[in-house]
Amino acid sequence: MDTKPKTTTTVKVPPGPMGYVYGRACPAEGLELLSLLSARSGDADVAVAPLIVGLTVESGFEANVAAVVGSRTTGLGGTAVSLKLMPSHYSPSVYVFHGGRHLAPSTQAPNLTRLCERARPHFGFADYAPRPCDLKHETTGDALCERLGLDPDRALLYLVITEGFREAVCISNTFLHLGGMDKVTIGDAEVHRIPVYPLQMFMPDFSRVIADPFNCNHRSIGENFNYPLPFFNRPLARLLFEAVVGPAAVALRARNVDAVARAAAHLAFDENHEGAALPADITFTAFEASQGKPQRGARDAGNKGPAGGFEQRLASVMAGDAALALESIVSMAVFDEPPPDITTWPLLEGQETPAARAGAVGAYLARAAGLVGAMVFSTNSALHLTEVDDAGPADPKDHSKPSFYRFFLVPGTHVAANPQLDREGHVVPGYEGRPTAPLVGGTQEFAGEHLAMLCGFSPALLAKMLFYLERCDGGVIVGRQEMDVFRYVADSGQTDVPCNLCTFETRHACAHTTLMRLRARHPKFASAARGAIGVFGTMNSAYSDCDVLGNYAAFSALKRADGSENTRTIMQETYRAATERVMAELEALQYVDQAVPTALGRLETIIGNREALHTVVNNIKQLVDREVEQLMRNLIEGRNFKFRDGLAEANHAMSLSLDPYTCGPCPLLQLLARRSNLAVYQDLALSQCHGVFAGQSVEGRNFRNQFQPVLRRRVMDLFNNGFLSAKTLTVALSEGAAICAPSLTAGQTAPAESSFEGDVARVTLGFPKELRVKSRVLFAGASANASEAAKARVASLQSAYQKPDKRVDILLGPLGFLLKQFHAVIFPNGKPPGSNQPNPQWFWTALQRNQLPARLLSREDIETIAFIKRFSLDYGAINFINLAPNNVSELAMYYMANQILRYCDHSTYFINTLTAVIAGSRRPPSVQAAAAWAPQGGAGLEAGARALMDSLDAHPGAWTSMFASCNLLRPVMAARPMVVLGLSISKYYGMAGNDRVFQAGNWASLLGGKNACPLLIFDRTRKFVLACPRAGFVCAASSLGGGAHEHSLCEQLRGIIAEGGAAVASSVFVATVKSLGPRTQQLQIEDWLALLEDEYLSEEMMEFTTRALERGHGEWSTDAALEVAHEAEALVSQLGAAGEVFNFGDFGDEDDHAASFGGLAAAAGAAGVARKRAFHGDDPFGEGPPEKKDLTLDML
């Protein structure tokens, strides 16, 4: 496998402090925007906000910096001092530690701090406990306000800090340089800044964490140095402990949270540290192994196998240590993406008033709620994969034979309260007698405590998590019964509620109530087998290989080795460029709008009669035929491209960026990205553990310290081997930049000195920059040397990919969307007897069942029917895409892909296809959906919710999430979206004798089905990705260039459509009414589109709903709705008087139509007129002239 060579680029960064404390008067404008984007619990005065230019930092803010992190002795005798600089970037979050109460809380949920304090000991995690010396020397927010001349009651203080040194502030290893204060302008306001520097400056050559920072007599302090007062602010330290360290501790299974903070800080200060960073006394969760046996961790079971469960615990802590080290490396990286600038956000363009601006931001955040819900409710989400299981040795007879898949992550959320074990497998004191929940098959409910743990026990992040969950659908769209919040609250007035968090007046907004409303979607942990990881990430490039055939005939495959051609010439002959030309011509014909690929362009004005339909279809066919023929001619004759091999190697591919500024402007979204990255790092580290353990005495006390560097190097060697793309940078200081820092002798109130010399500690930076995700286009069978288990898995997939021989319903074929949309124009008389409304379902069902009276058809009708049938049959004969086109864009791209598959002699199996589930937002569809935001609760809850619904413009956050699907991914990915998808990382060696480990990030599935997202369906031939677009919203728009199958309303309705019949519309409506009852009236056109993926039927459903409400005199009645549906069914079931019927089955089969698909070989009907397939047979080029060596298109 070829990999890109490592390239080294020199980047210049300015020297500076490791952070700032910003102090400002509470802004009069922009406060509502800042509140919406921040994470704050209503019972705390602290908050986490995003770093945004124009909102929290000034214009021109430099994201990358060479931070002062210490000092070194230089010169003869070591008498001089120079500064040690470390490249880093500023954290995408800022931490408000004073005045947070001025920001509106993210949710009205009460007592979230109490919930976190209760959950922390329940799961065994340590609480924040400042030392007495810290409290004695606290720098309070009031004191800082007084120094800055700000009113403490109206001031806002927040920390802006580099990514790698957040933990250093948490453990008081920094100080404020009060003499270096300056002023900047944010918006129209003047803001104070106080630089933050490390205490290590005053301890030359000391590159470690200072355990007792308030000891001014520390022996490492330089002679005559004026040691400053360390910066300790209790609210800030606790906020960092909860929002920064807590999530990492949960992800790494480290119950001693303070030790995680110190380990991370140590890795930041000591660039040469390679040994173990996490403490030796780390504990482990007891649980039953996934094989159903007791965990191989108890001492009595212990040493019969290879070290019993000892290796499992060792792999757990060493993988966590390696992941922490890798995260530290990424935190010191220098990235290209600038911080988000609110003045450039497209979503705010044209929004003149603060309310309108806030409403636009609220609508965008509601889009992201769909992705957050998927991460919470998917059982293989990175949020839940917190424990390590052991599959045992790959070869039971040879325990030393390494396996990449022996150790793997499993869901641990539901077993986190189990007893804790020490290194030897003994239960830790204090955990005796605790019940042990099983890894599979537990009965415990997903509760608020679990949600708190997912957020690292941070009330602020938990509040923002609830902000998103309040905007998630509880299952209405898939036919589940959603809890009636009004009734629940009313009934709870006389009963006890187990949460102990809320009162009757606040129950509607309580975290427990929100989880109860979403109960049908709670994750069900029914399997602990090794599988994919559900990750949250961001596409930061407009380029992706997500066309129907992926990266087939891509630039890299066509480029000649001698480099004799220019780039443009090569690009014009790629499959990607051919698809672009097709789409451009379709747009010129006004058939499509590339910006909205699902739209029908101006077809409504173009297709005014049946002749226009013929023209449109023929234009599409001829355009695609021409492009495909030219493409294949260029590939075969011009480049001698191995076109069949190229198809076998083609992949759908995209890259997820690790740049922190590409994530959404929200602390909770940044948490999801961080947890996803930590899960990926641990997966990679776990794959190398067995190789490190092989042949070693793992029980030795010093094994971890000795072999942690070995594991770390192995993980670093995985860079640039197919999955984790890395970048190597040479860091230099900006030209002419003076190194300004506090005087080491004059005190921290003295002005900064600019006479310092300094050097960069990490001159060469090698760090991962993106994750590459792939999905093979063709279904590939097991290789000859695959294991028996792998061959069995492939055999089980074959039936899912096997193309059936059945004839497809015309309306479910390539032209079905046009026939339904324009039926009244094409067949104006195609309506049931006694009806004035043309009905495509009735017409085509009767026609295909040979039940349509011939007298109803004119000659022109028959010619059009022949044209449609011929096209549909010919398309079906070569079709290997298990999706029917829903629009012209899909029709053209699918037809084009099928033509190329025909040239490549593909047969038998469907190819893999991609579907994007695009997150959208809308105002609450019902009063129930707005209950959590009602200004009053208790007995007045329903009235308060109705009042809110009547004045939605006054509530910028009152939006809910929704989804729509799109099967053409390139325009979706061009919007550089935030995404959620399943990721399975394969590891394998290269060529024989090569010990280089390659990886492949395989596009996989989210487990949980409709729990994760209502539009996910179980189809092995499709890969799904949830996407929330960024381009056009928070960044500039670029030019276009498996859970178990769940029977839901969505499947039921699509099954009805697939069965066909004249009464499809009424059957769909009846099934929906019976499933949803009165909630049917709440479904809007977007909901019907999401459920049915059929615009015509969606409009029919809205019409049925309107008629049902009219029949009930404005009130919903199930009887009236069913009556309307049955009347419609009766209308389309009439066939009129008996007489001669039109024989659709035989019609057209006797003619060998010349207008076939470019001479395609496929029998078009029962008459079986054979059509010669030129490429059929053992030797597709056997009839070519023997003397001609080069392959030509004519040979095909």
Curated annotation (Swiss-Prot):
What is the name of the protein in this document?
A: Major DNA-binding protein
Instruction: Just give the chief location class.
Output: host cell
Q: Return the Pfam families for the record.
A: Viral_DNA_bp
- Spell out the family assignment given in the record's similarity comment: Belongs to the herpesviridae major DNA-binding protein family.
SUPFAM superfamilies linked: Viral ssDNA binding protein
In its UniProt entry, the species of origin is given as Human herpesvirus 2 (strain HG52)
Gene, per the UniProt record: DBP
Q: Name one GO cellular component term.
A: host cell nucleus
GO MF entries: single-stranded DNA binding; zinc ion binding
Q: Which UniProt keywords apply?
A: DNA replication, DNA-binding, Host nucleus, Metal-binding, Zinc, Zinc-finger
* Function, in words: Plays several crucial roles in viral infection. Participates in the opening of the viral DNA origin to initiate replication by interacting with the origin-binding protein. May disrupt loops, hairpins and other secondary structures present on ssDNA to reduce and eliminate pausing of viral DNA polymerase at specific sites during elongation. Promotes viral DNA recombination by performing strand-transfer, characterized by the ability to transfer a DNA strand from a linear duplex to a complementary single-stranded DNA circle. Can also catalyze the renaturation of complementary single strands.
| Location of the protein in the cell | Host nucleus
